[in-house]
Amino acid sequence: SLPSGGMDNRTAYTTGRYPGYSITNFAPFLQNSYDINDIFTLSGGVRYQWTENRVDDFVGYAQQQGIATGLANSADTIPGGKTDYDNFLFNAGILAHLTDRQQTWFNFSQGVELPDPGKYYGNGTYSLVGDHYQLQRSVNVADSRLEGIKVNSYELGWRYTGDSLRTQLAAYYSTSDKSIIINRSDMTINVQPDDRRIYGIEGAVDYFIADTDWSLGGNFNVIKSEVKQNGKWQKWDV
């Protein structure tokens, strides 16, 4: 009772904030590598990613509160449903064996940013008619399909593997050119141009103490994220 100040807390009502949903992914891929010579190795592949979203019917959060507090007795549901989208994703890289203990590499890969259905679907505008909430407009599966946002990533790295010392350093850069927003005027989901980038440097060092089970190590990651606004890159808070 100490956290509640000695009061006996009771649940008045329970509401849901977002519609229930499930996500199914299917992603077959092909990947291969080829040794050009003793120094260089090429690698590459392709992946097909298919995603299906199933969303439950849902009553708006504010309308659930209104029913729970007695302001209304019932409400229309925002219809659920299912939608799917797919992407072909590619990757390629080259690895160079500088010495028996040192390697450097450059990789390009594509990923897909999967939107959260609960963040977009289940939004609606209602009007109270008598003791019933009538649905006017809504963001629903039938009217607005989500799609994956493709992300291109690049990485340049180097590593050293010694008997006791192991270290690695890599620079990375990733870009995307779209984002998903809700148009509140007509309650639809829009995919709009939106240039964003994330880049940084990361590294790690490990030292294994001889004749013991102990090791010392450390790592770091310096990252910066930016979004293009009015033709200029600005800080992007993520």
Regions found by a protein language model. Give the residues of each.
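Residue-level signature of outer-membrane beta-barrel architecture
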Residues: 30-35, 40, 86, 94-97, ...
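Outer-membrane beta-barrel translocator domains and adjoining extracellular loop/strand segments
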Residues: 1-5, 54-63, 117-123, 130-131, ...
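Transmembrane beta-strands of outer-membrane beta-barrel proteins
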Residues: 1, 45-47, 107-109, 168-172, ...
